């Protein structure tokens, strides 16, 4: 589900499933919806669920053990609203060409998932004149620098 569309995603999954399909949880980095408790974003419920999991699953370390943590970065590149579409069109080819070893997904921007588990997502802001870069990698600075160069060139071409 794309960022900003949690409720639409919940409805889509329910409609696509069978009569017994349940969506237990939907989230963005700053929004958590526990559908059994309601259709609203609920941080207090998230705290309660996490507390229960910590108590029943052997502590926070046990919950975190299967997760590989990598540095994460979000960066914004200035881009006039009227240039976003052209910049993103160019990035559909340019970003994968720069990171050819990765798998590409263009559902919600341009995302490249790399064999080492790192990833970069480039998408236009829906509210501000920026193209956003989101990345997670052991060397996140290098990945962001590479993406920034590609995004900067696409924005420059789109504004000229």
PLM feature spans:
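Phosphate-binding and adjacent anionic-ligand microenvironments
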Residues: 1-134, 140-141, 145-160
């Amino acid at each position: 589900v794309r960022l900003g569309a949690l409720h639409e995603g919940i409805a889509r999954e329910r409609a696509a499933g069978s009569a017994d399909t349940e969506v237990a949880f939907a989230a963005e980095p700053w929004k958590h919806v526990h559908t059994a408790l309601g259709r609203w974003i609920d941080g207090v419920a998230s705290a309660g669920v996490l507390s229960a999991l910590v108590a029943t699953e052997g502590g926070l370390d046990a919950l975190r053990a299967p997760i590989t943590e990598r540095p994460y970065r979000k960066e914004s590149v200035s881009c006039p609203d009227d240039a976003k579409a052209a910049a993103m069109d160019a990035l559909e080819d340019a970003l994968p060409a720069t990171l050819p070893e990765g798998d590409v997904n263009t559902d919600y921007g341009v995302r490249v998932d790399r064999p080492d588990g790192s990833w970069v997502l480039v998408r236009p802001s829906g509210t501000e004149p920026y193209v956003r870069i989101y990345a997670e990698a052991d060397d996140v600075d290098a990945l962001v620098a590479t993406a920034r160069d590609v995004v900067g060139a696409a924005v420059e071409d789109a504004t000229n």
